[in-house]
Amino acid sequence: MEETIGVTETAAIPKQRGEQLLDHAVRYAEERHWDVFAGTWLEPVEGRELCSCGAEDCPAPGAHPTVKDWAALATGSAVQVRRVWGKRPDASILLPTGRSFDALDVPESAGFLALARLERMQRTLGPVTLTPDHRMLFFVLPGAAAKVPDMVRRYGWSPAAIDLVVRGEGQFVAAPPTRFGGRGAVQWARRPTPANRWLPDTEELIDALAYACGREAAAERARRSS
């Protein structure tokens, strides 16, 4: 899989190629036992790349479901994955949350702060993605949505006051190397490895994430009041 991004380093964003997408989708199904499904794709139109959905103002061009009942399309079968991407090799790779994992979605700056803090504390991390819209997603065991609000309050923060979103049942995340139009590709900040096959529970990460998001929210309030 892709090289990961260090806490303080940057990396070139790989160009999305159809054959890569198939290979990655198969590995997610075979090696991680994650359900995957094919999303929209990018189409060249008059020198631009537009989403296959046809909306010029699409908020996630080439990186969202093609149908409303997308959950029924998600599969963990490598045979089915090969069949789907064989027909549409440039389709984005989307992963349903709430099945094998949930994702704790935070701003990129808060995510890097939390990542450094968690590594210093030698906490076990699961895979972590970095998106072109400057979000960082930490993969955790399913069931986070029911736990996070009380956990955040326990650490002295109001859930409504910090930018920490749980993606759980009925939602999805885009997987590397899916591209968001011309904005770039989803990347691994911490890639899936045999060592992180067993995902952490939300409790193992929430203190660092809540602290980082709370610190960022406080800084934003200070900027607005100055």
Label each residue range with its predicted role.
Residues 2-133, 143, 194-211, 215-226:
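Signature for HUH/AEP ssDNA processing cores
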Residues 138:
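Catalytic core of tubulin tyrosine ligase-like
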Residues 143-226:
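DNA replication initiation modules
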